[in-house]
């Protein structure tokens, strides 16, 4: 990684390394707690009728797509992680602070789910907002989605001036 990110100073990247680790720890710890305390399919109401913790073993990708295709999903995930890391390192000095945060979140979420695929052969999902959403997901998914939204916001609202010039 040091050769690939050789143009990035360690001091410049410490905030992103710290954010990456904090997000990864939150994701992995929440999965560990759910995996060790709940049975598959078990639901614990947190906010009645709105938010539950429900233990699901997802053997596909987001929204339950590609169930049982763990090999293909894992290969695609490794490629995506590599591309994200390459882009982040190559463009670190060119992209904005908001984009750096966004890519760090996406990278952390992708690594969090990849850890599950490698060590469990499934991804632990538990965040269940039945009142408004039919899918059950995890914190890694949250980080990825927030990161994508931040990139979209950056490009729509903050890069307009660059495009107009």
From Swiss-Prot:
Does the entry annotate any disulfide bonds, and if so which pairs? none
Membrane topology reported for the UniProt record: Multi-pass membrane protein
* Protein name per the record: Lipoprotein signal peptidase
Catalysed reaction(s) here are: Release of signal peptides from bacterial membrane prolipoproteins. Hydrolyzes -Xaa-Yaa-Zaa-|-(S,diacylglyceryl)Cys-, in which Xaa is hydrophobic (preferably Leu), and Yaa (Ala or Ser) and Zaa (Gly or Ala) have small, neutral side chains
The record's section on PANTHER family has: LIPOPROTEIN SIGNAL PEPTIDASE (PTHR33695:SF1)
Query: Active-site residues?
Result: 125, 141
Please report the organism this UniProt entry assigns to the protein.
Fusobacterium nucleatum subsp. nucleatum (strain ATCC 25586 / DSM 15643 / BCRC 10681 / CIP 101130 / JCM 8532 / KCTC 2640 / LMG 13131 / VPI 4355)
- Report the sequence similarity comment from the record: Belongs to the peptidase A8 family.
Q: Write down the EC number.
A: 3.4.23.36
Q: GO MF annotations for this entry?
A: aspartic-type endopeptidase activity; endopeptidase activity
Q: Could you tell me which HAMAP family the record lists for this protein? A: LspA
Q: Where in or outside the cell?
A: Cell inner membrane
Primary role: This protein specifically catalyzes the removal of signal peptides from prolipoproteins.
Pathway listed for it is: Protein modification; lipoprotein biosynthesis (signal peptide cleavage)
- Matching InterPro entries: Peptidase_A8
Q: Which residues cross the membrane?
A: 6-26, 68-88, 95-115, 132-152
- Record keywords: Aspartyl protease, Cell inner membrane, Cell membrane, Hydrolase, Membrane, Protease, Transmembrane, Transmembrane helix
Please tell me whether the keyword Cell inner membrane is annotated for this protein.
yes
A Pfam match is: Peptidase_A8
Q: Give me any GO biological process, just one.
A: proteolysis
Q: Name one GO cellular component term.
A: plasma membrane
């Amino acid at each position: 990684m040091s050769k690939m990110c050789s143009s990035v100073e360690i001091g410049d990247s410490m905030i992103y390394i710290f954010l990456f680790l904090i997000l990864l720890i939150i994701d992995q710890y929440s999965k560990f707690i759910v995996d060790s305390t709940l049975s598959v399919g078990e639901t614990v109401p947190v906010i009645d009728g709105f938010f539950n913790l429900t233990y699901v073993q997802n053997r596909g990708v987001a929204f339950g797509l590609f169930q049982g295709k763990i090999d293909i999903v894992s290969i695609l995930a490794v490629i995506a992680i590599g591309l994200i890391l390459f882009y982040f390192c190559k463009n670190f000095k060119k992209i904005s602070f908001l984009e750096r945060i966004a890519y760090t979140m996406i990278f952390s979420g992708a690594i969090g789910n990849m850890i599950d695929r490698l060590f469990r052969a499934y991804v632990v999902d538990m965040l269940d907002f039945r009142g408004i959403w039919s899918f059950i997901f995890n914190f890694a998914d949250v980080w990825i989605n927030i990161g994508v939204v931040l990139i979209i916001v950056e490009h729509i609202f903050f890069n307009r001036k660059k495009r107009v010039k």
